[in-house]
């Protein structure tokens, strides 16, 4: 099983908004298999939310850096919004997701993760139908580019009107969507906040589970720390993966283990402009990432899973 981490880990250390920028620091983390974060492209005048091909320059830069540093791309994370309440944002998201699917093809990435979108005031069934209607519009894109989109579990803690929170609900969504290229990404941190027995969730997803977001927390907030810093039972996670014969990657999304001052949802207190210790420097974060690689290797090898 490959150990993977996301470029979102280092994004804050680069003023360049290009999705390629964080790759410049990934070679000092110990990871060679990369989850490419395309989730932060929903900003004003972003090439990703406009018609045209300017966003492809960023993808070409990704290819160049990956070749120079010996990386390969295993999965991606598409942009997202929290709710359908703003039509302009929803339209921009549609363009950005469509471009992210094509970007995956250019980078030989087999799948990209998407989020469920809340429909405020709706029943669970109305929410489900609205999300299916929205994501079905990408059917042709996924087929043309041979790229899967993977729905990720949320939590009622921060989005109480988002009704995709468990393995059973994810499986129901995928089956009801009836899209050949729609499958599942399970987020262990979200599952821990939701209070799930993650063996049961993983078994419920079964063969539809194609990717993971591995991170930890104390069960109260979506803190995105590395494993063993919170209360997630990772024995249950790994046992569940073995039980279903999971064949995907072990992908970390622990981008706030060493927290920056503005890292949601746990913000550093009483920060002043003159403070020198508010944000960890890049080189220390890279060392933390290297430690996380060793933790992941130990976790998998403890269950006789070979690390690639």
Each model region followed by its residue ranges:
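Active-site-proximal loop/turn and secondary-structure-junction residues that shape catalytic pockets
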Residues: 9-11, 38-42, 79-82, 116-120, ...
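N-terminal small/glycine-rich loop or linker at the start of catalytic domains
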Residues: 1-8, 73-84
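Active-site acidic/histidine proton-transfer and metal-coordination neighborhood
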Residues: 60, 65-69, 82-183, 193, ...
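Acidic (Asp/Glu)-rich catalytic clusters
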Residues: 23-30, 52-75, 98-108, 136-144, ...
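Glycine-rich, proline-tolerant flexible connector loops at the mouths of alpha/beta enzymes
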Residues: 35-63, 122-123, 222
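Histidine-acidic metal/acid-base catalytic patches
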Residues: 1-12, 16-30, 164-186, 191-308
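Conserved beta-strand positions in the central sheet of alpha/beta enzyme cores
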Residues: 35, 75, 113, 150, ...
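The substrate-binding groove and active-site-proximal loops of carbohydrate-active enzymes
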Residues: 9, 49, 81-90, 121, ...
